């Protein structure tokens, strides 16, 4: 079995498939097609509530949204790979559990409509070789590509800032979820050969050139069932934000202009008012911010060993945060063993980390090209031991959303 799956990114070939799927479902050519990239977070995705930073890579796992205007005010949705269709209209635009993936597009329609934008009836077709259940930013890509398609089709005068507000209303008011700016920023602002660094304190992002040679980036869906072992919301309380705020110190020579206090006595004194579990996890938040800063610093210096150390340290941090699981830890331990000197923690040649919501499934690894085949063998061994059949994708940094 081949574990390194090839995603069709051939522009002309896949575009015809997208158009054909839309024609077959609705009997008309699409009026517009938008494409947005998948995404994974390298570090920092669990610290957004504390207004820290997240380092992300938009990747060439494209999601296509084709759309055509209707003569009425209804909305129809079709997901090609799921062979599933849904429908709604403005008067019944509500979150429905049974609508699953279609709720993402419905939320964007709500985001526009609730912002005073006038909508027309639209037929939508979603084409993605990676399903939303895998993670990897597919759901966000559906939302963002839908934004671009709706704006174009309905002739809406809607700035980029207004688009971000549409997405925020979609997430908070329709879906009832947090609005993670790093997700949207990666899908919108990314450029080839760059990472996206989101600063939640400044509500902004910047591009970080990413050009390590002779390396392959792999995303692995370990297919471990997600089991939530604790509620992250219990940590995301205003009083904890205030505590960590006391430990933020200005620093002119670091990204964002601040870092967390490193004096252990000071840290212990400030965190002495919380339980041991809460203290441990707040320390993980602080450590994760340092991992993000160290990753960016190493990338800018073209220092892969330092970058890899920071990534590996971030995964250990996620374990302390109670996000990882034995199956993913097993895979990443095998990655470390691919080094000729696996005990030399100062100069790793490969690295990897759990990514996403955690509690199972997503891993990214950045390997020497010569180690990709060996990693495939480890995945075969993983399947024999744990009984899960992983899927693995070779990816690279991709451009953000655009109309085709």
Regions found by a protein language model. Name each.
Residues 313, 359-360:
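Gly/Ser/Thr-rich loops at beta-strand to alpha-helix junctions
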Residues 124-126, 220-222, 363:
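A structural signal for short, well-ordered beta-strand segments
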Residues 130, 355-359:
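A short acidic Gly-Thr/Ser loop motif
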Residues 51-58, 236-237:
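Short Gly/aromatic-enriched secondary-structure transition segments
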Residues 1-39, 64-103, 194-353, 366-404:
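C-terminal nucleotide
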Residues 140-141, 362-367:
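FabD-like malonyl-/acyl-CoA
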Residues 55-58, 66-69, 116:
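Short, charge-rich binding segments
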Residues 2-34, 43-53, 92, 98-211, ...:
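Gly/Ser-rich oxyanion-binding loop with an adjacent helix/lid
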């Amino acid at each position: 079995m081949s574990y390194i799956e090839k995603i069709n990114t051939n522009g002309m070939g896949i575009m015809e498939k997208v158009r054909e799927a839309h024609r077959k479902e609705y009997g008309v050519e699409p009026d517009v097609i938008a494409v947005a990239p998948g995404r994974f977070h390298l570090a920092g995705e669990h610290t957004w509530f504390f207004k820290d930073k997240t380092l992300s890579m938009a990747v060439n796992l494209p999601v296509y949204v084709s759309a055509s205007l209707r003569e009425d005010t209804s909305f129809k949705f079709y997901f090609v790979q799921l062979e599933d269709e849904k429908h709604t209209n403005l008067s019944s635009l509500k979150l429905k559990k049974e609508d699953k993936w279609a709720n993402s597009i419905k939320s964007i329609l709500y985001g526009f409509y609730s912002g005073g934008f006038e909508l027309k009836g639209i037929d939508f077709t979603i084409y993605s070789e990676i399903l939303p259940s895998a993670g990897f930013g597919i759901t966000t890509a559906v939302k963002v590509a839908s934004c671009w398609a709706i704006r174009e089709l309905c002739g809406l005068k809607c700035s980029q800032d207004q688009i971000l507000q549409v997405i925020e209303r979609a997430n908070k008011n329709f879906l009832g979820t947090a609005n993670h700016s790093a997700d949207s920023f990666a899908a919108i602002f990314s450029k080839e050969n760059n990472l996206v660094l989101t600063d939640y304190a400044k509500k902004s992002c910047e591009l970080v050139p990413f050009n390590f040679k002779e390396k392959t980036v792999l995303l692995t869906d370990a297919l471990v069932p997600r089991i939530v072992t604790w509620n992250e919301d219990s940590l995301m309380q205003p009083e904890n934000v205030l505590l960590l705020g006391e430990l933020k110190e200005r620093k002119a020579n670091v990204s964002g202009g601040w870092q967390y206090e490193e004096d252990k006595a000071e840290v212990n004194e400030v965190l002495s008012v919380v339980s041991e579990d809460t203290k441990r996890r707040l320390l993980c938040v602080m450590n994760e911010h340092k991992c993000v800063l160290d990753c960016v610093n190493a990338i800018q210096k073209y220092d892969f060993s330092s970058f890899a150390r920071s990534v590996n340290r971030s995964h250990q941090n996620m374990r302390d945060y109670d996000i990882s699981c034995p199956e993913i830890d097993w895979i990443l331990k095998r990655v470390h063993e691919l080094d000729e000197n696996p005990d030399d923690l100062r100069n790793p040649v490969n690295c990897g980390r759990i990514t996403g919501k955690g509690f199972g499934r997503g891993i990214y690894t950045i390997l020497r090209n010569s180690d990709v085949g060996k990693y495939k063998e480890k995945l075969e061994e993983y399947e024999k031991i744990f009984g899960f059949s992983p899927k693995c994708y070779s990816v690279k940094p991709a451009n953000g959303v655009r109309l085709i």
